[in-house]
């Protein structure tokens, strides 16, 4: 194991740059990420100004990421679940779910908004085309509703459509523990992103911040930190 780091510090900031060799025993999801390229970060343009913790994960494409899961046990488990889901609902996970994703995933934890008392979790997935994303999500909803008793609900808040699909472990099927906190997601569409959360109130607070321009991109501290970094990344963490 080896790591080489360069440390630079002054009164205003501390900067660490360098390289490290990946362990052979590294988590298979980390290995898959490192082998799947990177993606331009833009999610901060829609994220709430209340964001306390922000992780941006980027790769060339979700399809590439899944194919990079060389861990046989994980990949076999994915393939088994995939066949069951596709057979049960009559959908293609690759064509109807993974294909519209551009490769940028933003996970945030925010301070409680006006409509709740608990920290809010948000997952924002950037779409290649939001029109295509909406079309495929509606197709998946239609198939699920036709073939199962799974609850599907839709409500409108201002000009935003809030959707809910009661399917536990939906994200874990595709991306394992990366998104295991989002079990039965509510979701809506904001700009080029499909935005998910475990609670409807979290999405409503998110929409309020977006409408009021209370955005992370306008935070001076975040803006300053981002100015020192490249616009494309595999893993980015801000707190």
Predicted stretch roles:
Residues 41-46, 78-83, 147-151, 220-223:
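Glycine-rich loops and low-complexity Gly/Arg-rich segments
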Residues 38, 42, 53, 72, ...:
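Generic amphipathic alpha-helical segments used as scaffolds and interaction surfaces in large
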Residues 31-35, 80-83, 87, 99, ...:
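Polar/charged alpha-helical tracts
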Residues 40-41, 62, 76, 92-96, ...:
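Short secondary-structure junctions and interdomain/linker hinges
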Residues 1-69, 104, 177-186, 199, ...:
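Leucine-rich, highly hydrophobic segment in Treponema pallidum outer-membrane-associated proteins
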Residues 36, 72-75, 88-91, 95, ...:
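Surface-exposed polar/charged interaction patches
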Residues 50-90, 145:
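Predominantly extracellular/luminal regions of secreted and cell-surface proteins
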Residues 55, 95-225:
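Single conserved position on a long alpha-helix in the C-terminal lobe of the eukaryotic protein kinase
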